Amino acid sequence: MNKLKKIIFVSLQSIMIAGIVCFAVCPISCKISETGIEVIGGDYVPPVLESVNVIDDKTVKVNFSESINLKGYVITEYIEDESDSYEHSTDEELSLALRTVTDFNNGIVCELSFENDNSVVVFRLHESTKIGKKYNIFAVVEDKTGNSLTCCVPFVGFNSKVAKMIMTEVRSVSDSKNGFREYVEFLVIEEGNVAGVQIQIGGEESKTYTFPAIDVKKGDVIVYHPEKVGEGIENEILDDLTLCHHTDSNENARDLWGNSEKSVIGNNDDIIVLYDQVNDFIMDAVMFRKADTVAWTKNKQLAADFINDAGIYDSSDIENANYTKGGTAPVSASAKHTLQRLNTSDILQKIHNDEKVELPVKVDSESWQIVKGGFSAGVVE
């Protein structure tokens, strides 16, 4: 009996000691095995990759959560199906980043420097990145205590000449019976590349569209179709503008498509923002509502707050929004009655006269209006 008590006491002691040790070594994962305590996690807390900032066509900054030592790196062009998202690895397996970083033969040559107590790595490439082209940074880093992180980080070539545009027409209501779908029409007022420019709808990230790398000229017309529904859909990325044969396409305009299978734009109430990410600049915005809508929803209020100081509207209060139903709207918004910018012809005249159009173009509650039967995707006049 005494022998049994002794065994139980010793066992309890062992369990308590094991538990204390496990707690003491957190955050290392551990378990109690037949042979004692066994470490099954990697290391303590590895560095965290916090952000990647493309500064210009030759400079990229990578920010970590703490001071790091860069053990190895490679910068390459985008690898299809392997570089679609951030990849971090803190285990003992050979990750994509670690596999790639062991081969320096195909990397883009660059020089390194460090900032902010070695928590920021600055890559200065010897060759310029191409506008809108995808690249990867593969790296292995360690902190001061040897905790390591391997990562595969995609970034996009810097857009050094962002094209300037304004919105000219919005169809907010679809008509599936006749094949009419919502769209936003744009007029290019200064040539350049549209890579990285965003169309933000209703303050919802899931509704945001980012333009691909396309060179455009002053006077070009672009039509963005959020709904990828119907026949004859083609993204006209290159010079041929006759590829698309959808009901809403026009061979004189460039048609670009989102990926949604359902409506994205609010029928009567919404805020659409044209945002230049590179220069942190709001090019254009339009707010619209039906007369009996007296407050924005939570997400739309975020969009309203975002454009409040842009100088487009006097303020982003809902009272300044353009009417789609009731109020001063001559007819209600529909697939055939679209919201149109009323001073488009004046802007076109400036373009034809080679006059500069300053952005943002100021508007008020009368600058946009529902036009009866006036829908004309891709036709700006």
Each model region followed by its residue ranges:
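N-terminal secretory signal peptides that target proteins for export/translocation
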Residues: 1-9
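C-terminal motif of bacterial Sec signal peptides marking the signal peptidase cleavage site
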Residues: 26-29
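A structural motif detector for short, solvent-exposed N-terminal "entry" segments of globular domains
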Residues: 31-44, 48-57, 147-203, 261-268, ...
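Acidic, low-complexity Ser/Thr/Gly/Pro-rich repeat segments typical of extracellular/periplasmic
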Residues: 59-65, 70-159
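Short proline/glycine- and polar residue-rich coil/turn motifs
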Residues: 113-117, 212-220
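Solvent-exposed beta-edge/loop recognition patches
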Residues: 130-132, 220-381
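Short alpha-helix capping/helix-loop boundary micro-motifs
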Residues: 205-212
